[in-house]
Amino acid sequence: GFNQLPLYGHIMAGRNAALPSNSAGPTGGRGLGPFLSQSAGTDKIQKNEPIIVDYVASVEAYNSDQTRIFALGKLKDELVKAHEAMRTIQNTLAEKGQPGVVTGDLYQLALDMAQSAGLAENFMGYPVPVPFIGHGVGLELNEWPVIGRNMRVPLEVGMTIALEPKVVFPDKGVVGIENTFVVTPTGMERLNRFPDDIIVC
């Protein structure tokens, strides 16, 4: 998943976003085929299903990664509560992500919080979760360090990291959040400005 696409984004909706695929990320999708799974498919977006929009912007050659959830009509309470849990995980990791904190410890904290929320089985992919919760971002979309299992990299001031906690519900869809942060002496400062709320149209 490293050094593949300079600019990128995908939109997936409902159960199609929750299908396993060859993706190295937490979401899958049917898309147009097995080699372009994280892409728009041919099904129409339905009411009351989550629409996940994951996209990258570039400013002066530096990338910023973010994900938002949209819906045509209100989502089920289960999905809304899971989305709120992912926001809480993101915000907690940003608060704890100070210089010297080891990336693997942040990953474990995210897993523990997902477990406490009753979402461990679906956290960061289903049926096989990916072993990370975030990644460096800069001139490339995916850079070091990785906030992942067994990663022992201490955070340093100035590192720029995308945190992306997500939950995959088979036959229902994907909810979660992603924002880009920069490590400061007191924690991670968020760079993206678009609201984290589910946007219901």
Regions inferred by a protein language model and the residue ranges of each:
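Active-site neighborhoods and metal-handling regions in enzymes and metal-associated proteins
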Residues: 1-201
